[in-house]
Each structure stands twice: as C-alpha cells, then as structure tokens.
Amino acid sequence: MARKALIEKAKKHPKFSSRAYTRCELCGRPHSVLRKYKICRICFRNLAHEGKIPGVKKASW
C-alpha cells in the first residue's frame, strides 16, 4: 500500500523542480532507473530478454 501511495505522489507535479525524482513506470522502484526508457534495470532486463524493447540485444564480444 505504501508503494502505491509513493507512486501516486511521484506522478504529481512538485512545488519545486528539485523535488522531482524518477521512478520505474512498471514497478515503482526508485533506484537504478534508466531515464531513456523510464524503467528500472530489472524491468529493462526482463523486457529485453522477452524482445519487447526494439533495438536492444544482449552484448557479446
């Protein structure tokens, strides 16, 4: 329940711009969020493995 409240709080426009912070749009995780995709590293990895993010593939060299 607390996580849902924090997600809703993060969606609101803050009074001061410095108070804004990124959260994962899928799970609400506040840390390790990739700004370009607006999702956390864990969700990014899962979606990349499923092939749901175009242009992303596992690196190998």
UniProtKB/Swiss-Prot annotation:
GO biological process terms on file: translation
General function of this protein: Binds 16S rRNA, required for the assembly of 30S particles and may also be responsible for determining the conformation of the 16S rRNA at the A site.
Cofactor requirements of the protein: Zn(2+)
Gene3D superfamilies per UniProt: 30s Ribosomal Protein S14, Chain N (4.10.830.10)
Native source species: Mycoplasmopsis synoviae (strain 53) (Mycoplasma synoviae)
Residues the record lists as binding Zn(2+): 24, 27, 40, 43
InterPro entries: Ribosomal_uS14 (IPR001209), Ribosomal_uS14_bact (IPR023053), Ribosomal_uS14_sf (IPR043140)
HAMAP family attached to this UniProt entry: Ribosomal_uS14_2_B
Assembly behavior: Part of the 30S ribosomal subunit. Contacts proteins S3 and S10.
Gene Ontology MF term list: rRNA binding; structural constituent of ribosome; zinc ion binding
Family: Belongs to the universal ribosomal protein uS14 family. Zinc-binding uS14 subfamily.
Pfam families: Ribosomal_S14
Keywords, alphabetical: Metal-binding, Ribonucleoprotein, Ribosomal protein, RNA-binding, rRNA-binding, Zinc
Name used for this protein in its record: Small ribosomal subunit protein uS14
NCBIfam families given in the database record: PRK08061.1 (NF005974)
UniProt-listed PANTHER family: 30S RIBOSOMAL PROTEIN S14 (PTHR19836), SMALL RIBOSOMAL SUBUNIT PROTEIN US14M (PTHR19836:SF19)
Cofactor note: Binds 1 zinc ion per subunit.
Annotated GO CC locations: cytoplasm; small ribosomal subunit
